[in-house]
C-alpha cells in the first residue's frame, strides 16, 4: 500500500443542497486526511479546460455547462491507496447503479448530477490537483 493524494470535487448539484459537510464527514470517517479545501465557481472555459479529456464525448458540452452553473468545492484527500479507495466511496457514475452507502447513491440525482468527481488514476490526480491547488495551498 502507498499513501496517495487525490482530487475530489463536490459538484454544483450537491453544493446547492448544502451537502459539502456530509460528504467531507463521510470521507473523513473512512480514515482519509483532508489536506486542501476551497469553494469556487468555475467559468465555462475553466470547466472545458478541466474536462478536456472528454472533449470528443457527446456529454462534454452539457458537463461543462453544469460544472460552471454554480459553486463547487475542491478538495485534496490523502491516505493509503486514496485514488482507488475514494472512487469506491464515491460509487458508480450513475447513482442508480451505485452501491448502497456510496456518495453517489446517497446524494446523486442522475448520471450528470451525481454529486462528486474524483481522480480516476495517479496520472489524472497529478494533473487535476494542480489545476485547483498550488503547493502552498496543500497542508501536510
From Swiss-Prot:
Keyword Cell membrane applies: no
BP-aspect Gene Ontology terms: CTP biosynthetic process; GTP biosynthetic process; UTP biosynthetic process
Reaction catalyzed: a 2'-deoxyribonucleoside 5'-diphosphate + ATP = a 2'-deoxyribonucleoside 5'-triphosphate + ADP; a ribonucleoside 5'-diphosphate + ATP = a ribonucleoside 5'-triphosphate + ADP
Signal peptide limits: none
Cellular component per GO, a single term: cytoplasm
Superkingdom of origin: Bacteria
The entry's keywords: ATP-binding, Cytoplasm, Kinase, Magnesium, Metal-binding, Nucleotide metabolism, Nucleotide-binding, Phosphoprotein, Transferase
CDD domains: NDPk_I (cd04413)
PROSITE patterns reported in the protein's UniProt record: NDPK, NDPK_LIKE
GO molecular function: ATP binding; metal ion binding; nucleoside diphosphate kinase activity
Residue sites binding ATP per the record: 11, 59, 87, 93, 104, 114
Active-site residues per Swiss-Prot or TrEMBL entry: 117 (pros-phosphohistidine intermediate)
Protein's cellular compartments: Cytoplasm
Record EC number: 2.7.4.6
SUPFAM superfamilies from the UniProt entry: Nucleoside diphosphate kinase, NDK
Cofactor: Mg(2+)
UniProt-listed Gene3D superfamilies: Nucleoside diphosphate kinase-like domain
Keyword Iron-sulfur: no
Record text on subunit structure and interactions: Homotetramer.
Protein purpose: Major role in the synthesis of nucleoside triphosphates other than ATP. The ATP gamma phosphate is transferred to the NDP beta phosphate via a ping-pong mechanism, using a phosphorylated active-site intermediate.
Protein family: Belongs to the NDK family.
Protein name (database record): Nucleoside diphosphate kinase
Source organism per UniProt: Persephonella marina (strain DSM 14350 / EX-H1)
Organism lineage string: Bacteria, Pseudomonadati, Aquificota, Aquificia, Aquificales
Primary gene name: ndk
Amino acid at each position: 500500500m502507498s499513501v496517495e493524494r487525490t482530487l475530489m470535487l463536490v459538484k454544483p448539484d450537491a453544493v446547492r443542497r448544502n451537502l459539502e459537510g456530509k460528504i467531507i464527514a463521510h470521507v473523513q470517517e473512512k480514515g482519509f486526511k483532508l489536506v486542501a479545501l476551497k469553494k469556487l465557481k468555475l467559468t465555462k472555459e475553466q470547466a472545458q479546460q478541466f474536462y478536456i479529456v472528454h472533449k470528443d464525448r457527446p456529454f462534454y458540452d452539457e458537463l461543462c455547462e453544469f460544472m460552471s452553473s454554480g459553486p463547487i468545492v475542491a478538495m485534496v484527500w490523502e491516505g493509503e491507496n486514496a485514488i482507488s479507495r475514494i472512487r469506491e466511496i464515491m460509487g458508480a457514475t450513475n447513482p442508480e447503479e451505485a452501491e448502497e452507502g456510496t456518495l453517489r447513491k446517497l446524494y446523486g440525482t442522475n448520471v450528470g448530477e451525481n454529486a462528486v468527481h474524483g481522480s480516476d488514476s495517479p496520472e489524472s490526480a497529478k494533473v487535476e490537483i494542480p489545476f485547483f491547488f498550488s503547493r502552498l495551498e496543500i497542508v501536510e
